[in-house]
């Protein structure tokens, strides 16, 4: 199986330990898929700064293909800053700077590469909602992570990104079945087949076309 993780890459920087780690939803998906034995590829815009080199090195070391990623000269990598407090990370700020690479712009070459995938995974963090219709029109199974923020759970956002999603994933607080059904309803109305809510230690719930 070939998986292409489409979208974001960042550096997580921890101020109080002065450590840097590669991250981003798409990067994490690609790495974990490769570790589980899948043929994994990351597709997203890369800068040419030192932080981008950290991301590239980690992806290569984990067996992830990045050969189709555009490398944008003079552009920088988004940095998410945290402190670690009592073993938990505490968010400080996001630094994009004036030269951030920005979201990937999908052209003919990227579409041709995406056609080779069996599974495409993207997310709200890719910042590519207006490009999702073209991706979902491809033959691959398509999974989309809506994250945890309410701004990605509006009717307007759903209308923009739901054009053939096979699996929608949402990070949620613990809820009962009635609340879960209410969460799923607008997605199922827009043709989403499977909706998965993850609730941390409270477990998960899956809805298949409202069942």
Locate each region found by the language model.
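Ribokinase/PfkB-type carbohydrate-kinase core domain
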Residues: 1-4, 58-60, 66-69, 85-210
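Substrate-binding N-lobe of the ribokinase-like
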Residues: 2-3, 9-79, 85-86
């Amino acid at each position: 199986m070939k998986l292409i993780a489409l979208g974001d890459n960042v550096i997580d920087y921890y101020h109080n330990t002065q450590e840097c780690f590669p991250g981003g939803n798409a990067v994490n998906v690609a790495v974990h898929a490769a570790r589980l034995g899948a043929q994994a590829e990351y597709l997203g815009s890369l800068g040419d700064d030192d932080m981008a080199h950290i991301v590239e090195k980690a992806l290569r070391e984990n067996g992830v293909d990045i050969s189709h990623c555009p490398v944008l000269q003079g552009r920088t990598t988004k940095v998410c800053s945290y402190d670690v407090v009592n073993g938990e990370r505490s968010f400080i700020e996001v630094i994009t700077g004036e030269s951030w690479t920005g979201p990937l712009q999908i052209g003919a070459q990227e579409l041709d590469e995406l056609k080779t995938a069996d599974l495409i995974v993207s997310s709200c963090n890719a910042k590519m909602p207006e490009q999702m219709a073209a991706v979902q029109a491809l033959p691959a199974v398509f999974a989309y992570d809506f994250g945890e923020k309410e701004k990605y759970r509006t009717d307007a956002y759903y209308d923009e990104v739901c054009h053939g999603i096979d699996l929608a994933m949402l990070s949620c607080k613990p809820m009962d079945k009635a609340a879960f059904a209410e969460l799923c309803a607008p997605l199922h109305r827009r043709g989403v087949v499977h909706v998965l809510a993850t609730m941390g230690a409270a477990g998960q719930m899956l809805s298949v076309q409202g069942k």
